[in-house]
Amino acid sequence: KLKGTGVRVTRVGDQIILNMPGNITFATNSADISASFYPVLNSVALVVNEFEKTYVDVIGHTDSTGSAEYNQQLSVRRAQSVSSYLQSQQVLPERLLTSGMGPNSPVASNDTPEGRALNRRVEIILTPLT
């Protein structure tokens, strides 16, 4: 369901991780979801609802440009935006845990524009109920 959307899907142990790059999710310095990203989030919601016996962590990440405090707040607001939208698509709120990591969990170097782009992302982690 997510093929061709720009969302990278990875399985780590029992978890399924959906990595959504920031460039397709939000405008710079904004927590407003890009209109072009709603169809992708609709597909994400279908996947999340398909795996109904899971907890859903929605985690916002930023690059290191700007202050750590600002980036922390931005990452939380972005995760909250995605979480709110998933709730509007019938994902139950009690399944959702929303957090922001700011610039603290980079997946690439913040020394290059390409690396910073990779670090600006929202991850959704599906963890089975135990």
Give names to the regions the model predicted.
Residues 2-11, 25-59, 83-88, 124-130:
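Periplasmic peptidoglycan-binding/anchoring modules of Gram-negative envelope and division proteins
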Residues 31-35, 59-130:
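Periplasmic OmpA-like peptidoglycan-binding domain that tethers envelope proteins to the cell wall
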Residues 13-15, 121:
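Conserved catalytic motifs of the protein kinase core domain
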Residues 13, 24-25, 113-116:
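Short alpha-helical interface patches
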Residues 16-21:
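Short, aliphatic-rich beta-strand segments
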